[in-house]
Swiss-Prot record:
Cofactor(s) named in the record: Mg(2+)
Species the sequence originates in: Histophilus somni (strain 129Pt)
Gene3D superfamilies xrefs: P-loop containing nucleotide triphosphate hydrolases
Protein name per the record: Probable GTP-binding protein EngB
Domain of life: Bacteria
Source lineage: Bacteria, Pseudomonadati, Pseudomonadota, Gammaproteobacteria, Pasteurellales
Length: 204
């Protein structure tokens, strides 16, 4: 496998889509970021790219209602998916997001990996486990990012990472776990290395 190092700082916003019908051509490689509505997806994308406002963050969970695409390089895209779980929105809208999310995950051929973000203090909720289960059954590699790691002491953080690593063993598949904090720059390098690995087939 070719070793590559992409420059994520050059990432730029491409488009927002309410569903997969209006997404660009299904080609290249897309890496999707998924997680509960308050898991910190947008914050992680901003930290990775060193751009404060690339992905819009909000104090109100559930504001990412669309599929948002960002281009790293031609044929290399990052995708911010609608948050799942809690969101202070009408039920009808919530169902619409879930439909968009499900369609993207099931039908998008160029999906090359899934980054699932979970608050390190509340990991592996039911919907997170369903996501992991689905990805493993679809043969997709997964990186679990335990966000807001700065909220715990180093020993508590290590304990949580170990606990999650043990808890996911029954899922089998290619699932890795890392602590992450945008604020303290924990795990950003691990994330970019993993993305490089997933994008590398395009450069071989």
């Amino acid at each position: 496998m070719t070793n590559i190092k992409l420059n994520y700082h050059k990432t730029h916003f491409l488009m927002s889509a309410p569903n997969i019908k209006v997404l660009p051509e299904d080609s290249g490689i897309e890496i999707a970021f998924a997680g509960r509505s308050n898991a910190g997806k947008s914050t992680a994308l901003n930290a990775l790219t060193q751009q404060k406002n690339l992905a819009r963050t909000s104090k109100i969970p559930g504001r990412t209602q669309l599929i948002n695409l960002f281009q790293v390089e031609p044929n290399c895209k990052l995708v911010d998916l609608p948050g799942y779980g809690y969101a202070a929105v009408p039920e009808q809208m919530k169902l619409q997001w879930q439909k968009s999310l499900g369609e993207y995950l099931q039908k998008r051929e160029c999906l090359g990996g899934l980054v699932i973000l979970m608050d390190i203090r509340h990991p592996l909720k039911d919907l997170d486990q369903q996501m992991i289960e689905w990805a493993v059954s679809a043969d997709l590699p997964v990186l679990l990012l335990l966000t807001k790691a700065d909220k715990l002491s180093q020993s508590a953080r290590s304990k949580q990472v170990k606990m999650v690593r043990e808890a996911i063993l029954p899922f089998q598949g290619d699932v890795q776990v890392e602590a992450f904090s945008a604020q303290n720059k924990i795990g950003i390098e691990r994330l970019s290395e993993k993305l490089d690995q997933w994008f590398s087939p395009l450069f071989s």
